[in-house]
UniProtKB/Swiss-Prot annotation:
Pfam family, one: AMP-binding
Gene field: ACSL3
Annotated SUPFAM superfamilies: Acetyl-CoA synthetase-like
Entry EC number(s): 6.2.1.15, 6.2.1.3, 6.2.1.2
Protein name listed in UniProt: Fatty acid CoA ligase Acsl3
Taxonomic lineage from the root: Eukaryota, Metazoa, Chordata, Craniata, Vertebrata
Catalytic activity: a long-chain fatty acid + ATP + CoA = a long-chain fatty acyl-CoA + AMP + diphosphate; (E)-hexadec-2-enoate + ATP + CoA = (2E)-hexadecenoyl-CoA + AMP + diphosphate; (5Z,8Z,11Z,14Z)-eicosatetraenoate + ATP + CoA = (5Z,8Z,11Z,14Z)-eicosatetraenoyl-CoA + AMP + diphosphate; 15-hydroxy-(5Z,8Z,11Z,13E)-eicosatetraenoate + ATP + CoA = 15-hydroxy-(5Z,8Z,11Z,13E)-eicosatetraenoyl-CoA + AMP + diphosphate
Intracellular or extracellular location(s): Mitochondrion outer membrane; Peroxisome membrane; Microsome membrane; Endoplasmic reticulum membrane
Residues modified to Phosphoserine: 683
Transmembrane segments: 21-41
Organism whose genome encodes this protein: Pongo abelii (Sumatran orangutan)
Length: 720
């Protein structure tokens, strides 16, 4: 089989519209600056280059199927952050005692909310937000203790399930800490899940209590509570909705404040509570998986602690000066793990949302500040979809610059790329050229962590350069408590996900059908298996799937079969090159990696999203494309095509024009002829988690996309 497209990022092309004399002078200044700064940077860059090039992981023996471990954990895998802190309640107690009066959780006050009429007549809600208001470690501990005690008074028993269906906010983390303290098993549900998925999860886990928000209660839960017969108590984190008459008899609605007050009163009477064991379930995390109904992954206290131990080791100098911005779904293992890492190290966590993240975000009123401008975070996690969006938005702005500004940006970009490859910094470029781009995320970001899906080399290098910080690309699954690998901060290579964390080991298993073997040259390849304390307990009430994906070796260590295909590079870093489920055999016998096709085309300015499709009954690949509205409209103008947005997307002529652009890009990316889409369908509607066509991490839900576009599939292949 062929490898993925090359991960080496290319330089930006210079537009030859700048005065040659001026261009020569700029090049002269760059050369002079490089010479003057060579000696001071030499000693620093040598150290950085040495770290970047060093061996980061090694096989533990000489066999082809040997597991790889971080060089920092060859003698044994790490499993705890702090001695004696083997459950999450102990970790928080340790942090509370150490950072007692330090700020922990921050929320912005809503000063004003108003309706804004758009040119197309639609009404958007806009908000003006104030400063961040903070709760200290002590405040959060007391609130969590009281809330847990209040839940106990409502009948919640240790080792029984309680659900949280809520947006990312401080109350989510307070509720989670309460459950960890009182040994309640926390069932997490994405706020974007549809009704059938919510009903399935709540009934499967047999919850009697659910924690939610006023908005989600009104928009999603209200219509399905009658389908969840065991439900008795609904706790809203932000006050009661105005009417209650519609709720079935037997369901009582409480506010979080009322439950906390009940718990505070009861705690005066020294109500005892059950402490968890490391092996007890902490979270049952329902994944908004890419196939079928969501599955609940059982994650123990020891699983999560091992995972955050490994993650924390990859963030140098993590501590009280750091500020993390929380906006991804806390029901996603990446966000939950990242926040627990910060909480355990004295960092502040300021809450946000995708709609209020930046000054230009959709809910922020023009002229007021978004959350990153107010919080100025130093740490941030993101999924590739968000980074791709930032990349495309900035590049659109660059294309609108004057010729001189655009060429100056490109010169600085290419110069910095060259310097980064040598381990050097570029403080002048950072200050004068990239300062405005960096300010989009507050200006203080020192580390961006990306996970949830593969990040393209182009986007990763762009974020490195323009935001003046390393991008730690990670790899992990809900089934591995979010942990697996993270690239080191001084490793500026792209297209890889780093070496195994100190909490786990990784081996490659032969996959004959795909043609991947751990004896392959020059690099071993195969299905990625993850082993260690991070490997979770399996799927809730799904023994067959658990047996298929998990196993124990002769030493009693648990392993997870990920279904992803990887290869180890000589320095011990892992590269994701394929996925078993994404591999399709065409009618003529060729194998096509759908993920490879999508990765080659997704970063085109014309493409907002793309899903490649093929099956074994046909000899060619087709695709569904969400085009970029601005780029498609401009292409239509150039080709003399007119119509509304929907008419353009439904136009055969427009499909053919877009297909030409895709085909050229596919050839440039060295795709084989049989891998290049032959026909496409343009979608006028974006794919969001709300549509059910992508997960909350914006991974494609192939089954749902196939169903959604079934008529188009039949059209493109010809009905048989």
């Amino acid at each position: 089989m062929n490898n993925h497209v090359s991960s080496k990022p290319s330089t930006m092309k210079l537009k030859h519209t700048i005065n040659p004399i001026l261009l020569y002078f700029i090049h002269f200044l760059i050369s002079l600056y490089t010479i003057l700064t060579y000696i001071p940077f030499y000693f620093f860059s040598e150290s950085r280059q040495e770290k970047s090039n060093r061996i980061k992981a090694k096989p533990v023996n000489s066999k082809p199927d040997s597991a790889y471990r971080s060089v920092n954990s060859l003698d044994g895998l790490a499993s705890v952050l702090y001695p004696g802190c083997d459950t999450l309640d102990k970790v928080f107690t340790y942090a509370k005692n150490k950072f007692k009066n330090k700020r922990l959780l921050g929320t912005r006050e809503v000063l004003n909310e108003e309706d804004e009429v758009q040119p197309n007549g639609k009404i958007f809600k806009k908000v003006i937000l104030g400063q961040y208001n903070w709760l200290s470690y002590e405040d959060v501990f007391v609130r969590a203790f009281n809330f847990g005690n209040g839940l106990q008074m409502l009948g919640q028993k240790p080792k029984t399930n309680i659900a949280i269906f809520c947006e990312t906010r401080a109350e989510w983390m307070i509720a989670a800490q309460a459950c960890f303290m009182y040994n309640f098993q926390l069932v997490t549900l994405y706020a974007t899940l549809g009704g059938p998925a919510i009903v399935h999860a709540l009934n499967e886990t047999e919850v009697t209590n659910i924690i939610t928000s006023k908005e989600l209660l009104q928009t999603k839960l209200k219509d399905i509570v009658s389908l969840v017969p065991r439900l008795r108590h609904i706790i809203t984190v932000d006050g009661k909705p105005p009417t209650w008459s519609e709720f079935p008899k037997g369901i009582i609605v409480h506010t979080m404040a009322a439950v906390e007050a009940l718990g505070a009163k009861a705690s005066m009477e020294n109500q005892p509570h059950s402490k968890p064991l490391p092996s007890d379930i902490a979270v049952i995390m329902y994944t908004s998986g890419s196939t079928g109904l969501p599955k609940g992954v059982m994650i123990s206290h020891s699983n999560i602690i091992a995972g955050i131990t490994g993650m924390a080791e990859r963030i140098p100098e993590l501590g009280e000066e750091d500020v993390y911005i929380g906006y991804l779904p806390l029901a996603h293992v990446l966000e939950l793990s990242a926040e627990l890492v910060c909480l355990s190290h004295g960092c502040r966590i300021g809450y946000s949302s995708p709609q209020t993240l930046a000054d230009q975000s959709s809910k922020i009123k023009k002229g007021s500040k978004g959350d990153t401008s107010m919080l100025k975070p130093t740490l941030m996690a993101a999924v590739p979809e968000i980074m791709d969006r930032i990349y495309k938005n900035v590049m659109n702005k660059v294309s609108e610059m004057s010729s001189f500004q655009r060429n100056l940006f490109i010169l600085a970009y290419n110069y910095k790329m060259e310097q980064i490859s040598k381990g050097r910094n570029t403080p002048l470029c950072n200050s004068f050229v990239f300062r405005k781009v960096r300010s989009l995320l507050g200006g203080n970001i020192r580390l961006l962590l990306c996970g949830g899906a593969p990040l393209s080399a182009t986007t990763q290098r762009f974020m490195n350069i323009c935001f003046c910080c390393p991008v730690g690309q990670g790899y992990g699954l809900t089934e591995s408590a979010g942990a697996g690998t993270i690239s080191e901060v001084w490793d500026y290579n792209t297209g890889r996900v780093g070496a195994p964390l100190v909490c786990c080991e990784i081996k490659l298993k032969n996959w004959e059908e795909g043609g991947y073997f751990n004896t392959d040259k020059p690099h071993p390849r195969g299905e990625i298996l993850i082993g260690g304390q991070i490997v979770t307990m399996g799927y809730y009430k799904n023994e067959a799937k658990t047996k298929a994906d998990f196993f124990e070796d002769e030493n009693g260590q648990r392993w997870l079969c990920t279904g992803d295909i990887g290869e180890f590079e000589p320095d011990g870093c892992l590269k994701i090159i394929d996925r078993k489920k994404d591999l399709v055999k065409l009618q003529a016998g060729e194998y096509v990696s759908l993920g490879k096709v999508e990765a080659a085309l997704k970063n085109l300015p014309l493409v907002d999203n793309i899903c490649a499709y093929a099956n074994s009954y046909h000899s060619y690949v087709i695709g569904f494309v969400v085009p970029n509205q601005k780029e498609l409209t401009e292409l239509a103008r150039k080709k003399g095509l007119k119509g509304t947005w929907e008419e353009l997307c439904n136009s055969c002529e427009m499909e053919n024009e877009v297909l030409k652009v895709l085909s050229e890009a596919a050839i440039s990316a060295s795709l084989e002829k049989f891998e290049i889409p032959v026909k496409i369908r343009l979608s006028p509607e974006p794919w969001t988690p709300e549509t059910g066509l992508v997960t909350d991490a914006f991974k494609l839900k192939r089954k749902e996309l196939k169903t959604h576009y079934q008529a188009d599939i039949e059209r493109m292949y010809g009905r048989k």
